[in-house]
Amino acid sequence: MEFVFLGTGAGVPSKGRNVSAIALQLLEERGQTWLFDCGEATQHQILHTSVRPRRIEKIFITHLHGDHIFGLPGLLGSRSFQGGTTPLKVYGPKGIKQFIEVALSVSTTHVKYPLEVVEITEEGTVFEDNEFYVETKRLSHGIECFGYRIVEKDIQGALLVDKLLEMGVKPGPIFKRLKDGEVVELEDGTILNGNEFIGPPQKGRIITILGDTRYCEASRELAQDADVLVHEATFAAEDEQQAYDYFHSTSKQAASIALQANAKRLILTHISSRYQGDTYKELLKEARELFSNTEIATDLKSFPVEK
């Protein structure tokens, strides 16, 4: 599991930062990539990374401001042009379906893979399978905006092979049956309960990716006990009133959310173009004063998520 930040700027592109897009690489977990937001020129940014459009399985849109969606039609079309055939599902607020349909229709763009658009109308679980589930809550922004909590389900513990070998049980199909939790009778009549030969489960990871937002309780709830919290930091602490007026957060407010939520790690993104060169490091310094395990994303930077 790895983050690849494709765009980390706020509002409009700048020389140093493109607009919002984050790839969550789940190559080891499911051989796929999930994309969060898709601002203008996202597919161009992808060319400089290991992200492959054909592997994008899901796209989660936080809200419908242009800096978060204007790259979507182009990416959807290019994925088809490059030979993508596997299904793709897009999640987002009401209006995302119309945006995609109109953009593809007017430009006569035809996708050759199954494309499904899910409009989120209620908070709660928007996706679940055997490996992950994704929950969402409304944030505090000028238009409807969602944050996403991605939860990896606990992974079954390993088969206690050494314990079985010590008992004289030879490797073979019986190992798989025990790993599946079956009750097995050996040739000598010994009964083995598979559940007694499975090690402790490996706890799954929790990832929280927030859209644009003021400091709010929903952010804390989504970030509770997260292994990684990705939070916007459009402004410095001295501009807190301006952040509030424009429905955004400061770096210190992001750190406060991480601290309150007992998150393990904080990554700041959505940085205003006013912070050029190394001036963005002041945002990092302010956040670390409150939450030490803070990093700040830059375009094309990767962040592994350890188990």
Swiss-Prot record:
Binds 2 Zn(2+) ions. InterPro entries: Metallo-B-lactamas, RibonucZ/Hydroxyglut_hydro, RNase_Z/BN. Zn(2+) 1 binds at H63, H65, H141, D212. GO terms for molecular function: 3'-tRNA processing endoribonuclease activity; zinc ion binding. It catalyses: Endonucleolytic cleavage of RNA, removing extra 3' nucleotides from tRNA precursor, generating 3' termini of tRNAs. A 3'-hydroxy group is left at the tRNA terminus and a 5'-phosphoryl group is left at the trailer molecule. The keyword Protein transport does not apply. Its cofactor is Zn(2+). The active site is at D67 (proton acceptor). Keywords: Endonuclease, Hydrolase, Metal-binding, Nuclease, tRNA processing, Zinc. Its EC number is 3.1.26.11. It comes from the Bacteria. Signal peptide: none annotated. Zn(2+) 2 binds at D67, H68, D212, H270. The keyword Zinc applies. Belongs to the RNase Z family. Zinc phosphodiesterase, which displays some tRNA 3'-processing endonuclease activity. Probably involved in tRNA maturation, by removing a 3'-trailer from precursor tRNA. Homodimer. This is Ribonuclease Z. It comes from Bacillus cereus (strain B4264). The gene is rnz.
